[in-house]
């Protein structure tokens, strides 16, 4: 099975094996490159959460415990300690789907405080190293 089919079929076993081979620290590093675990809008919304992308060091600092393989495996399917926001997942998925172009969402409020649609997003840069 390849990545495309594993995603299409939501094949957990494929992602368990990838996670096991890569390890949680490489998963964490890659997830952060896609914008997971980071605020999207910055100070625009005071209530926005960053989420959490765990690593061995995070667990040691936060819980005083060592990381175990089972945690790596479930991290591979987005379970365990991972916390993300819907907009983070949307932007990550868009970057995968469009071949590596990272975009930031834009919120436009008109004079009447109504959210207006945006005609076109401008890509910031191409990050196709993460897309194979």
Q: What would you call each of these model-derived segments?
A:
Residues 1-132:
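Beta-lactam-recognizing serine transpeptidase/beta-lactamase-like catalytic domain environment
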């Amino acid at each position: 099975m390849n990545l495309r089919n594993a995603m299409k079929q939501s094949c957990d076993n494929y992602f368990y094996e990838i996670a096991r081979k890569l390890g949680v620290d490489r998963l964490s590093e890659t997830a952060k490159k896609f914008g997971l675990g980071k605020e999207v809008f910055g100070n625009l919304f005071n209530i926005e959460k960053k989420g959490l992308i765990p690593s061995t060091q995070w667990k040691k600092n936060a819980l005083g415990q060592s990381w175990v393989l089972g945690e790596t495996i479930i991290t591979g399917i987005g379970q365990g300690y991972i916390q993300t926001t819907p907009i983070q997942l949307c932007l990550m998925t868009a970057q995968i789907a469009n071949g590596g172009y990272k975009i930031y969402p834009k919120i436009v409020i008109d004079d009447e405080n109504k959210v207006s649609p945006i005609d076109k997003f401008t890509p910031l840069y191409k990050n196709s190293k993460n897309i194979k």
